[in-house]
């Protein structure tokens, strides 16, 4: 089924409201295996809507119109659709009864002829009751094309779609998706590596999305059951993860989790809990962002003992007992400083892990290091590891955010190696 969504309303074209209905409908239709090919917005104008209906009827098998079902003069969606199909408007008894009750309970409200429009549907249509409003929707098939009219307010449209429309559109297959999350590899490199899979995809499909500091891959397939979908998605996932970077590194090393809501931080916090281990932090450029991120998760007190925010050289020396002369000799942005910060954070809190971040957030360089230079240290019983990352060409906020992601990834790898 090839679907098209037509949003009716001049206020959409003038930017007075955002057309969130199209996004909601596209998402829900995809979940039941209906592909949306076109989204269009048109003003409250009969001539232009008639023209658009003519185009839609030639290229789509499902045409959904949203908005324009109200009582005002510019609410003309049902009237225009009826004219296009050569049909009359008739009253839906249930909607008319609801309208009668509404005005009976509000004797001060004036009931005008325009109000009656809300209880009308195109002749032959299946009514779609409105749970939260007065304007009834409808579904009608003519010459192989299914037409649907829905109210514009999201509070009315959403329950009508979920409870009335989708059950009537259900087919034998649904769309199932799986999201893979990658860190440490850019979107362009990932897309290049997966070029053959992307170019030759039919079903299942994969689509990359770049986010701040990471990349996600959405794998989707149409299937009649979750079990059938899992089989197809498992095959595609393994094909993806078996690929290697140009340096010969498996993509499995970059894939850290699944799902829309998963994050590096959530993975690390849960793994620390599972292993019964604790962590402490000493932060300079990130000014407590790592610690605040850990504290966002419930039960963080079981794995997070505490930490230090040591922005200046003096505080690094005073709070972490690192000799000032050594800091001056090596610089606050250095492998040495990151190592000592991590080790002292671990030692002073008696934690299993000590993590440190020191670097240049910008906008100016520091100690000869360009903006985006970050040293991250991880101290544990086996020793201390320090990595240097370059997060160039980013805003100050992004440098700090991505630096924290690198820190969580370093901890994640250490936990996996235990």
From Swiss-Prot:
Q: Which domain of life is it from?
A: Bacteria
Report the Pfam families cross-referenced here: CinA, CinA_KH, MoCF_biosynth
What InterPro entries would the database entry show?
CinA, CinA-like_C, CinA_C, CinA_KH, Competence-induced_CinA, MoaB/Mog-like_dom_sf, MoaB/Mog_dom
By sequence similarity, the record places it as follows: Belongs to the CinA family.
Q: What is this protein called?
A: Putative competence-damage inducible protein
- Whichever gene encodes this chain, its name is cinA
